[in-house]
Structures are given as structure tokens and as C-alpha cells.
Amino acid sequence: MWIDCKTIARSIEERTKERVEKLGFTPKLVSVACTDDPSALSYLKSQRKKAEKLGIAFEIMNVSPEEIVSTLKKLGSDESVNGVFVARPFPLGLDEKEILSSVPVEKDVEGVNPANLGLLLYDEEIFPPCTAEAAVRILERETNLSGKRVTVVGRSVTVGKPLALMLLKKGRDATVTVCHSRTVNLEEITKNSDIVVVAVGRAHFLKKNMVKEGAIVIDVGINYVDGKLQGDVDPSVEEIARVTPVPGGVGQVTTALLFEHVVRAAERQRK
């Protein structure tokens, strides 16, 4: 069974639009780009369309590798800008940690600054990473997480690690296992899980025999195979479990949350 993520994204967007109207001013998102990656550029185009739909001002700033850090710092003091997004991947040779640390904390709508990531250790979700939060929102709609055995396959800074912390948060109270490329007996672990979240970047990695019947599976994968977008979960898993589709799944909710964060940032800055 496929999980309906479109309805979740639409609900977030409707609430965001209502909050924009109550602000009394037009919030603004600036996306900083220092990449020629086709998928990154495509995402920036989709951001523009979504911003127009929600009544949010939007600007793309194309910068050189030498300018990216200083540009991000300047945006921090620009009162006309409420949210800052930085497109990835970065050109080879750039210090990713330095760049992400330069995203203004109070405008870090994608939740990539180490300062915002660190708050997750204290159960504070001011600007959590959008993809990790999308997985949580979907799961909370599908089930009560308390006591559920959740396996997160992947330990990235943007998905796996923050998601594990968010699922452990008091009030959600999931029992979380994080697996990775060196995990022994992965199939045994996923097969005994109520929920499996996969974010490894390998098309159709999670097979039907690795999932128990009735489980919930969140597919965070983005892989292009012969020009077609594929997830990390094999389509056959849908026969025995509830699965988020790719495309049209976690990605839609992620984008909706990005703009929810822009409005949240604007509301916090207005106070």
C-alpha cells in the first residue's frame, strides 16, 4: 500500500499560506547557489513555483566559490530576508562544514547549521532538517510512534542522524536502531522492525524479504536509473507494507516544510 504524501504536503501548505496572510508582510526566502548540478538547479526552480503559490518572495543568488561564505554572512544581517537556503552539492575543494556554519542560525530554514542540529540533542526542534522532519510528520500521521521499533538505514548528517534524535524525542518515544554500510545482519534487523526508514542512495536497496508484513517504510532515496527517478525501496515491498512512493513521497513533504520554516523564521524575527 502506498502512503498518500500529497495530502500531507497539501495540508502543510494550506496552513503555511494562512500564516503568511496573518503576518502582515511578505516573507522572503533567498536560495544561494554555487553549483551546476542539474538536480539542484531543478529543485531551485521548483522552489520558485512553490513560493509564488504560497505568497512568499523568492530570490536565487548565484555566487562563486570564493563568495559563498561571505554572501551567507551578509544575508544574516539583511532584514529583508527571513530564510536562507544553500544549494548542494558544493564544488570540490570547498569546506562544507564552514559553509553550513555560515548559514544564519535564525534564518536556517533547511536546518543545516551545526548549531541548529545540536539543539536536537536537547529535544528542541526550531529548524530541524526538512527531510528528517518530513519523515517524522509522515510517520506521526500513520501511527503512534511510542514504543515502536524503528530502524534508520543511513547515518547522514541531514537525514539519518537527526532523524534518529527526533524519533527518540520525549513524547515520540520510539526505540531506534541506526544501521549503515558496516552493519552486520541488516536483513535480520529490518525484518524485526515496525518501521524502516531508508536513506542510502542506492536504487531498490531494500527488498521485500527484508521487511515484515504490515510494516511502515519511509523511502528517502533519490536515484536516477536510465533517466528515471527511483527510490531506495524495491517496488515489491509495497505488496506487504505501507510505503512512501518515489517520486511524490517524502520529497513533496520536505519542500512544504521548507516554506513552513520560512514563515516560522519570519514570525520569530518579528517578535
Curated annotation (Swiss-Prot):
Q: For NADP(+), which residues are the binding ones?
A: G154, R155, S156, S181, I222
Instruction: Supply the EC number(s).
Output: 1.5.1.5, 3.5.4.9
InterPro entries reported in the protein's UniProt record: Aminoacid_DH-like_N_sf (IPR046346), NAD(P)-bd_dom_sf (IPR036291), THF_DH/CycHdrlase (IPR000672), THF_DH/CycHdrlase_cat_dom (IPR020630), THF_DH/CycHdrlase_NAD-bd_dom (IPR020631)
Single GO cellular component term: cytosol
Q: What is this protein called?
A: Bifunctional protein FolD
**UniProt KW keywords:** Amino-acid biosynthesis, Histidine biosynthesis, Hydrolase, Methionine biosynthesis, Multifunctional enzyme, NADP, One-carbon metabolism, Oxidoreductase, Purine biosynthesis
Quaternary structure and interacting proteins, as annotated:
Homodimer.
GO MF term list: methenyltetrahydrofolate cyclohydrolase activity; methylenetetrahydrofolate dehydrogenase (NADP+) activity
The pathway noted for it is: One-carbon metabolism; tetrahydrofolate interconversion
Q: From the UniProt record, give one GO term of the biological process aspect.
A: methionine biosynthetic process
- Family listed: Belongs to the tetrahydrofolate dehydrogenase/cyclohydrolase family.
- Which domain of life does this protein belong to? Bacteria
Q: Which reaction does it catalyse?
A: (6R)-5,10-methylene-5,6,7,8-tetrahydrofolate + NADP(+) = (6R)-5,10-methenyltetrahydrofolate + NADPH; (6R)-5,10-methenyltetrahydrofolate + H2O = (6R)-10-formyltetrahydrofolate + H(+)
**Main function:** Catalyzes the oxidation of 5,10-methylenetetrahydrofolate to 5,10-methenyltetrahydrofolate and then the hydrolysis of 5,10-methenyltetrahydrofolate to 10-formyltetrahydrofolate.
